[in-house]
């Protein structure tokens, strides 16, 4: 990306914030009247054209104004959005919930999710994950020359069977070698760490397995079908139609499928584990869902139970607010319950 000036950065900031607040494409006239009265119209138009050329802004087809692109939102989120809540009544409601010692921590978190979802009109997902489930063994049973059953056993007594199909019977030997490596190196590894561990073993596997990409992908998919006691609760589905971007039938269907999905949350959790971030924004294009944003944070209830809170929003969202709300809950939890 070409270097952009401080003025152009501020211009992008104003356009994002105005579009988030109004849902109206932003033209040079609005920018000058509301944000940059001392800058000439020609300069603003040139800067907007430059930001568009960089892919940070897009032209709206129904007006002369611009709207942020996904890249523009990402730039804004990274450079300008700081966690912040200016709704004191909302903070008071949440504090009162956390102060109520007659409720269990699970109920406190549920009530907090409901309050936030009702306030923002956005879905809020609570995901509980028992991270103590360990991999105990992987076995393979040959069915015929083109298929085999992979059996995965975990510490909670769960036994998962899946069939792998392949064209070349030589792959059977590759699968057997790969499983032997896994059993040597991954036994008693927490399920949530499997992906990272396997990633670090790729060079070893590549040396011993001819069709390592196919075999590795197939086995990883089988391992990831193990659900380590994941319990998902969704709040705010009924408010989806209040979000203009979700009123399109196909987009609404996509959002509902996301809320029912499990794999999407595993991808997001994997990304958060890699970054080590307390509160993370994941843009939908990173997980094959355009024009959607996932904001998440983790609450460590105890050593066995990790709870993830996720908000699902359109890219046109107040990033400071959703980050602020999640950090507020995390801070209240850590002050009084951890």
From Swiss-Prot:
Q: Which domain of life is it from?
A: Bacteria
Q: Name one Pfam family in it.
A: HrcA
Q: Which UniProt keywords apply?
A: Repressor, Stress response, Transcription, Transcription regulation
Signal peptide range: none
Its family remark reads:
Belongs to the HrcA family.
**Annotated function:** Negative regulator of class I heat shock genes (grpE-dnaK-dnaJ and groELS operons). Prevents heat-shock induction of these operons.
Protein name as it appears in the record: Heat-inducible transcription repressor HrcA
Native organism is Malacoplasma penetrans (strain HF-2)
Specify the taxonomic lineage: Bacteria, Bacillati, Mycoplasmatota, Mycoplasmoidales, Mycoplasmoidaceae
């Amino acid at each position: 990306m070409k270097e952009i000036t401080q003025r152009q950065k501020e211009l992008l900031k104003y356009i994002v914030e105005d579009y988030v607040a109004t849902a109206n494409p932003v033209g040079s006239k609005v920018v000058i009247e509301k944000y940059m009265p001392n800058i000439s119209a020609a300069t603003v138009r040139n800067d907007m054209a430059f930001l568009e050329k960089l892919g940070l802004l897009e032209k709206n087809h129904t007006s002369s104004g611009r709207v942020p692109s996904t890249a523009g939102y990402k730039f804004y989120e990274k450079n300008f959005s700081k966690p912040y809540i200016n709704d004191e009544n909302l903070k008071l409601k949440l504090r009162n919930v956390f102060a109520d010692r007659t409720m269990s921590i699970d109920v406190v978190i549920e009530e907090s999710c409901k309050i936030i979802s009702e306030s923002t009109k956005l879905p809020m997902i609570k995901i509980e994950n028992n991270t103590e489930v360990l991999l105990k063994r992987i076995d393979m049973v040959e069915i015929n020359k083109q298929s085999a059953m992979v059996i995965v056993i975990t510490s909670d007594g769960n036994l998962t069977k899946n069939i792998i199909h392949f064209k070349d019977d030589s792959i059977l030997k590759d699968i057997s070698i790969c499983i032997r490596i896994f059993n040597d190196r991954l036994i008693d590894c927490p399920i949530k760490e499997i992906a990272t561990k396997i990633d670090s073993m790729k060079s070893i596997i590549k040396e011993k397995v001819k069709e390592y990409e196919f075999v590795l992908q197939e086995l990883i998919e089988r391992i990831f079908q193990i659900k380590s006691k994941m319990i998902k609760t969704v709040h705010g589905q009924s408010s989806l139609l209040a979000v203009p971007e979700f009123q399109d039938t196909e987009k609404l269907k996509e959002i509902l499928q996301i809320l029912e999905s499990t794999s999407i949350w595993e991808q997001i959790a994997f990304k958060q584990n890699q970054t080590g971030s307390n509160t993370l924004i994941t843009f939908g294009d990173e997980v094959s869902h355009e024009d959607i944003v996932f904001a998440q944070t983790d609450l460590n209830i105890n050593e066995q139970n990790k709870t993830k809170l996720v908000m699902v929003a359109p890219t046109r969202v107040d990033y400071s607010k959703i980050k602020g709300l999640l950090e507020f809950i995390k801070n209240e939890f850590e002050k009084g319950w951890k």
